[in-house]
């Protein structure tokens, strides 16, 4: 079975150095000295390796000569660069090579021999056809951690079904929980790409930790579909035990009422969450100033409020139209109830908490310094790094020299259009 390939491979001497050795151009970080070979494109793979790169790993991003990662062509809004590429590829080294040619394949195998981790998010079977599958590479390098991210996983009846975030959201039930009663909606960010990328990062870190004990790598198989299933939360339990399909309730909560954004009299939305009996009491007395709701049998308990959601929601909506948003914010703040605003992106980027926590950073790029969103990871002894966004293939020659290629050999690879 492939999941045992790395663990069962015979340990052999490595010809190109030790895993975890110090390498050039690394900032201090929790993963300093870890080399990740990234055969990645689009979102799920690059987001995983950005997490690793932010924490100090040396990520070598393999790209197609001339065009690079397909996400480079999505738009050109960042002074000519793609917003998606800028988002996902800071702190990485760009290595441009044609893996389909024999000489390019040999370079890739030598790189894998000297890597701690290989991440690929090709369709299942593509890496094997290229000669870069787990069986072969783990036999050469038994310490290699080989992580595959795909739509549905490396086996099963949907293995070869093409996958995009929207399609997986639908197949995995995310869309069944999202939207309004008369129409479904997808989550606005690519949630299944992000979920699978985070599970991949966790899996890689776990495998690195286990390798410290065993000396051996292993194969990791992550799917967007299963990552989305794992994030369905309590909905499967309601179906298993009550036969209950989730309602689509828009920006409301399925089981807590009132909960969500309500338009105030000046057209600004105010979000609130009334989740406990205490909060319901405080909300009725001090915020809504409708003590009679506490005596209404339709609203006494959380199940009662859920059962009579329509009546209660309509009452709260009408109430909020009576005052401007700042009055509701004041009442909620004074009552110490959970609340917030619905901010646009411009407001988010100027949010005082984001500014205070330095979540907006600048990073070098081929077009000069550009703003990026920082990392939510905050480790007291392992700072996140903010180095640079690479131009296509900028690190190809240095990486080849590190592998022992001479200037003449590099020129030959370039003449043959391998790099």
Task: Identify what each model region corresponds to.
Residues 2-213, 391, 397-419:
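N-terminal helix-loop segment corresponding to the beta1-alpha1 unit
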Residues 66, 152-153, 224-229, 266-268, ...:
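Glycine-rich beta-alpha junction loops
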Residues 197-217, 230-242, 284-290:
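Oxidoreductase and adenylate-handling cofactor-binding alpha/beta cores
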Residues 154, 181-191, 212-228, 244-254, ...:
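Conserved Rossmann-fold dehydrogenase catalytic segment
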Residues 183-192, 263-268, 382:
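Flexible glycine/proline-enriched surface loops and loop-helix/loop-strand junctions
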Residues 85, 249-254, 260-261, 272, ...:
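Short Gly/Pro-enriched turn/cap motifs at secondary-structure boundaries
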Residues 334-386:
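A glycine-rich dinucleotide-binding beta-alpha-beta segment and adjacent secondary-structure elements
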Residues 258-335, 339:
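Aromatic-enriched alpha-helical interface/lid elements that frame and gate functional surfaces
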């Amino acid at each position: 079975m492939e999941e045992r390939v790395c663990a069962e491979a015979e340990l052999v001497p490595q010809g190109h150095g030790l895993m975890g050795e110090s390498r050039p151009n690394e900032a201090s970080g929790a993963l300093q000295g870890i080399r990740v070979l990234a055969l990645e494109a689009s979102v799920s793979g690059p987001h995983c390796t950005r997490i690793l790169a932010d924490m100090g790993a040396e990520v070598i991003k393999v790209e197609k000569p001339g065009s690079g990662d397909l996400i480079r062509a999505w738009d050109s809004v960042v002074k000519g660069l793609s917003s998606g590429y800028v988002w996902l590829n800071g702190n990485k080294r760009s290595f441009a090579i044609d893996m389909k040619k024999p000489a390019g394949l040999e370079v890739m195998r030598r790189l894998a021999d000297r890597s701690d981790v290989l991440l690929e998010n090709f369709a299942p079977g593509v890496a094997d056809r290229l000669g870069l599958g787990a069986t072969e590479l783990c036999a050469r390098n038994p310490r290699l951690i080989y992580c595959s991210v795909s739509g549905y996983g490396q086996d099963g009846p949907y293995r070869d079904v093409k996958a995009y975030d929207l399609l997986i959201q639908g197949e995995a039930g995310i869309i069944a929980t999202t939207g309004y009663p008369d129409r479904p909606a997808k989550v606005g960010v690519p949630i299944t790409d992000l979920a699978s990328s985070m599970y991949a990062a966790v899996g890689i870190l776990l495998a690195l930790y286990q390798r410290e004990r065993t000396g051996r790598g292993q194969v990791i198989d992550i799917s967007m579909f299963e990552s989305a299933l794992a994030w369905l939360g309590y909905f499967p339990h309601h179906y298993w035990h009550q036969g209950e399909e989730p309602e689509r309730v828009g920006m409301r909560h399925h089981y807590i009422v009132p909960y969500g954004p309500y338009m105030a009299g000046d057209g600004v939305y105010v979000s609130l969450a009334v989740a406990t009996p205490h909060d319901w009491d405080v909300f009725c007395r001090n915020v809504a100033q409708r003590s009679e709701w506490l005596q209404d049998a339709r609203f006494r308990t959380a199940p009662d409020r859920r059962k009579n959601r329509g009546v209660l929601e309509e009452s709260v909506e009408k109430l909020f139209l009576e005052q401007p948003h700042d009055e509701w914010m004041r009442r909620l703040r004074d009552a110490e109830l959970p609340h917030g605003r619905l901010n646009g992106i411009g407001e988010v980027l100027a949010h005082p908490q984001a500014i205070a926590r330095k979540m907006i950073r600048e990073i070098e790029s081929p077009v000069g310094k550009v703003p990026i969103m920082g990392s939510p990871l905050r480790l007291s002894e392992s700072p996140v790094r903010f180095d640079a966004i690479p131009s296509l293939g900028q690190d190809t020659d240095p990486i080849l020299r590190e592998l022992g290629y001479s200037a003449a050999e590099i020129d030959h690879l370039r003449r043959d259009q391998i790099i």
